Amino acid sequence: MENNVQPYDVAGYAIASALVRLLVKKAIITAEEGKAIFSSSAEILKDAPAMRTSRREKLQLSKIMEDIISSLDPDADGSQKPQTHERQ
């Protein structure tokens, strides 16, 4: 995959992750369902060229997906962590 195409892949995952987080926040799906969506995606796409075309951390889909999955982890008492999203 050419490097000029990869930012579009990243943008797609950024949009998808925002939608999944919104669904979790609005209690349309559970945090576990959101994690399952991204865990499945990560497993399917682990060998995709877009997952390894950039050395820049902001554009590494694997890092983005790890951050999304960890943001959906419930706290120890079972409540959902506040949804925070850092802009880089």
Swiss-Prot record:
Keywords assigned: Early protein, Host cytoplasm
UniProt superkingdom: Viruses
Reported induction: Expressed in the early phase of the viral replicative cycle. Expression of early genes is repressed by viral Repc (latency) and favored by viral Ner protein.
Subcellular location(s) per record: Host cytoplasm
GO cellular component term of the entry, any: host cell cytoplasm
Protein name: Uncharacterized protein gp15
